[in-house]
Design a protein with these regions (language model features):
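Active-site loop-to-helix "anion-binding N-cap" substructures in soluble metabolic enzymes
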Residues: 1-160, 164
Length: 167
């Protein structure tokens, strides 16, 4: 959203769906930072759940802005990153925030790291890797690292979005 509010990218519907699926009351907080949003999270009791609005509505998020991260940190006592797929991004909510809170890897992150270690450490041979994704540029370093370790390397990279069926 390039730092601008976009109703189609709002997390409000996610909060509503999460509440319905979990049978929990989910407090949706429409503004991620500021005194009012922090006051709401500070009033929470054990077992209550809140969801902040999409952080990418703030340019500071993707800029890994320390002041923004410090404002986000005001909501919490610890930071747990359980999103292995986003761990490579240096954003305020995934990187800079760890300067202001004790930071831990969550159970899914730990499992992913253990699997990666097993695959790259001393795996049973032959070894094949399947690497996919939309951004070729973000895969170059990974591919260069994997090539000497693999007998087979398959790369599925989405190059473009066709506007009409290809036949």
């Amino acid at each position: 959203p390039k730092g601008k509010f976009n109703v189609e990218m709002s997390l409000k519907p996610v909060a509503d769906s999460l509440a319905q699926l979990s049978n929990l009351r989910i407090e949706f907080i429409g503004e991620s930072v500021g005194k009012e949003s922090v006051a709401k999270t500070k009033e929470m009791k054990a077992g209550e759940v809140a969801l902040l609005e999409n952080l990418r509505f703030h340019l500071e998020e993707e800029a890994n802005d320390s002041e923004f991260a410090e404002q986000l940190a005001a909501h919490a006592e610890i930071y747990v990153n359980d999103a292995f797929s986003a761990a490579h991004r240096a954003h305020a909510s995934t990187h800079a925030i760890s300067k202001f809170l004790p930071a831990y890897a969550g159970p899914s992150m730990v499992a992913e790291l253990e699997a990666l270690q097993a695959a790259l450490g001393d795996p049973k041979r032959p070894v094949a890797a399947l690497v996919g994704g939309a951004k070729v540029s973000s895969k170059i370093d990974v591919l260069q690292h994997l090539v000497p370790r693999m007998e087979k390397l398959l790369s599925l990279i989405h190059i473009s979005e066709p506007t009409r069926p290809l036949h």
